Design a protein with these regions (language model features):
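C-terminal alpha-helical interaction module
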Residues: 1-8, 41, 75-76, 82-86
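Local sequence-structure signature of Cys/Sec-based thiol-disulfide redox active-site neighborhoods
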Residues: 1-28
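Structural micro-motif
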Residues: 48-57, 67
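Thiol-based oxidoreductase modules, predominantly thioredoxin-like and allied folds used
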Residues: 28-40
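Short alpha-helical
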Residues: 13, 39, 64
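Non-catalytic, surface beta->alpha helical segment in thiol-disulfide oxidoreductase systems
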Residues: 58-85
């Protein structure tokens, strides 16, 4: 089973969009709220090299943000990535 982690903030529209996309695909994920925990924000930056949210990881591989996740989904590559990692 794939491990999906998404770093978010409470008021981020792209974070909400990413979670809706994952929910629509019935994928389970762990959400880490970086607006409530500065150490988790630093962890996200260290792992992804980015400061923006959301940051999405599948099996510890950085996927990027909502635009990146959406592009993978539209191209069919998200399903392939998830199947490959099952």
């Amino acid at each position: 089973m794939q491990k999906i982690v998404i770093y978010t903030t409470a008021t981020c529209p792209s974070c909400i969009g990413a979670k809706k996309l994952l929910d629509r695909k019935k994928l389970k994920y762990s959400e880490i709220a970086v607006d409530k925990d500065p150490a988790k924000r630093e962890e996200m930056i260290e792992l992804s090299g980015r400061r923006s949210v959301p940051q999405i990881f599948i099996n510890d591989k950085p996927i990027g943000g909502f635009d990146d996740l959406s592009a993978l989904d539209r191209s069919g590559k998200l399903d392939s990535l998830l199947l490959k990692n099952e």
